[in-house]
């Protein structure tokens, strides 16, 4: 199990052990930097939401992990993938009463309503900016656009701000990604300078 465990920090600064896992390594995209790209000849697999929820709660109950870091290749479409992630987190939170930490990757291109549902179930959301320019994105990740990546990042930021206001003001208000938002950028795969 150790190879699937990573560490992260909660909103209150605690370091937690997380099960870091993909919902699936199937992907409709052909990003040149990704081992799970459509054109790469690799063995494919996918969890069902129930399988992944059961695996997570089993590890949690044995004290192997304190939370989940859930990402995914894009299976069929961004919406379909996000729906499966939501179903997994919903099973964990509502059926298994999982109170551990959850970091989920928002899927660019998914319906904003699905991103909202994901953020209400997860402690932290992230959406990878991938590359510093549209030109590099077009060359290395031809199926993605800067807009499809920046749109959910902006939505997450705005909903976090609104949620912080509501939680401070109204008793029982639902928290949206209370531990924040993060992103990742690939450095060195494209010709941009640090300044750019």
Question: How would you describe each model-predicted region?
Answer:
Residues 1-24, 38-43, 96:
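N-terminal [4Fe-4S]-dependent radical SAM core
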Residues 23-28, 128-132:
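Short connector loops/turns at beta-strand edges and beta->alpha or beta->beta junctions
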Residues 25-37:
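Local cysteine-cluster metal-coordination motifs and their immediate loop/turn environment
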Residues 53, 58, 76-196:
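Conserved AdoMet/S-adenosylmethionine-binding subsite of the radical SAM
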Residues 64-69, 178-182:
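Glycine-rich, often proline-containing surface loops adjacent to acidic residues and nearby aromatics
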């Amino acid at each position: 199990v150790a190879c699937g465990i990573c560490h992260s920090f909660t909103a209150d600064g605690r370091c937690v052990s997380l099960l870091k896992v993909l919902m699936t390594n199937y992907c409709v995209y052909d990003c040149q930097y990704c081992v799970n790209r459509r054109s790469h000849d690799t063995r494919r697999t996918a969890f069902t939401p129930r399988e992944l929820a059961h695996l997570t709660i089993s590890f949690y109950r044995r004290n192997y992990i304190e939370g989940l870091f859930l990402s995914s290749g894009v299976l069929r479409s961004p919406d379909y993938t996000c729906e499966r992630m939501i179903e997994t987190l919903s099973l964990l939170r509502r059926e298994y009463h999982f109170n551990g930490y959850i970091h989920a990757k928002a899927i660019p291109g998914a319906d904003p309503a699905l991103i909202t549902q994901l953020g209400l179930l997860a402690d932290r959301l992230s959406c990878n900016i991938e590359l510093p320019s549209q030109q590099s994105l077009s060359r290395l990740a031809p199926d993605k656009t800067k807009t499809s990546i920046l749109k959910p990042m902006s939505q997450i930021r705005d909903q976090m701000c609104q949620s912080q206001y509501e939680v401070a003001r109204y008793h029982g208000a639902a928290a949206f990604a209370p531990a924040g938002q993060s992103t990742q950028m690939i450095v060195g795969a494209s010709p941009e300078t640090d300044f750019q």
